[in-house]
Amino acid sequence: MSFKELDPEVWSAIQQEGARQNRTIELIASENFASKGVRAAQGSVLTNKYAEGYPYKRYYGGTEYVDVVEQLAIDRLKALFGAEYANVQPHSGSQANAAAYMAFLQPGDKILGMDLDAGGHLTHGAKVSFSGKMYQSYTYGLDAESEQLDYEAIAKQAREVQPQMIVAGASAYSRIIDFNKFREIADEVGAYLMVDMAHIAGLVAAGLHPNPVGIADVVTSTTHKTLRGPRGGVILSQEKYAKKINSAIFPGSQGGPLEHVIAGKAIAFGEALQPEFKAYAAQIIKNAQAMAEVFTATEDIRVVAGGTDNHLFNLDLTKTGLNGKQTQELLDSVSITTNKEALPNETLSPFITSGIRIGTPAITTRGFNEADARHVAELIVTAIHHYDDAKVLKDVKKEAEILAMTHLFE
């Protein structure tokens, strides 16, 4: 019996989602298109196998083949980032962060991470997150004029707070992060340094962003986004920390690992080790910079921090008459997918926001080049400037869908 015959409702929803992905232009910075190999691994018989523990040291029998798969993932990940130690079991980036905190901190310890409005992540100390509930969290922001990290201000804050851990990394920051400066700050106050490179991992792997491995005490990441793998997490560190990180994952915060997802991770890491991945990562940045230039040339759409060095950037829509939520919904209506984004010193609700975030990993996977990226940016500008003109929006949608359908993913 086919999948369609077995469950036509689920099958239909999946088919419709596939069609939606192909006909829309995906600009959510945290999304990408996984390869056929990655997707096949996740739908393989490995989903049937329980394997508590670690390769060659399990609590269950019958693990000889999942051991091979997980060890491949570990070895490839270590090679990709030059790490002494790697754990590929975290179910997500948030799980990886939770385990990293558990391994190095005690409940009530102080952490200093990037503020949400500055581009940080919920798990970097936001009060609504476990990281802001289990630990005393403090946050740093950006320089008011440059909208970039102010390392002297962060150092001053670290001296005042005296945190046990400093967290570097972001989910909406468009400039290079100087991990060596964070290391100096952490050393000065006697803190551990954790880097969350979830968004930039693919760029780091390609040598296009500084590598935090070997600088930070612990590095966490997701495996999708710029790495183009399955949805999941990883932890990288030094061998001396292996035992406590392993224990923080299992049995500390997870039970059985998802070996079918780990197989997908292994495939993605293998893909990222190939020479063509560096060209792909370079094109991501070129596309982001090409788009940012289009917005910079307008009078009412401002690129936060003045541009981008990576795969994303934020747009300040204050002068357009639209907020982030309205713009996200507007662009959805013309088959361009983005997300609303809080800006530095945001005054609106996180459900509304003053901006949107733009990312290029997904369109680059589909073969978009700089000319295509500029075309997309121009469509966005047209939609924003004619948000109440149904005829113009109809034309923008048609053009966006034609552009998308000429860059199909497999």
From Swiss-Prot:
One of its GO terms (biological process) is tetrahydrofolate interconversion. Its EC number is 2.1.2.1. GO terms for molecular function: glycine hydroxymethyltransferase activity; pyridoxal phosphate binding. Gene3D superfamilies: Aspartate Aminotransferase, domain 1 (3.90.1150.10), Type I PLP-dependent aspartate aminotransferase-like (Major domain) (3.40.640.10). Keywords: Amino-acid biosynthesis, Cytoplasm, One-carbon metabolism, Pyridoxal phosphate, Transferase. Belongs to the SHMT family. This is Serine hydroxymethyltransferase. It comes from Leuconostoc citreum (strain KM20). The lineage of its organism: Bacteria, Bacillati, Bacillota, Bacilli, Lactobacillales. The gene is glyA.
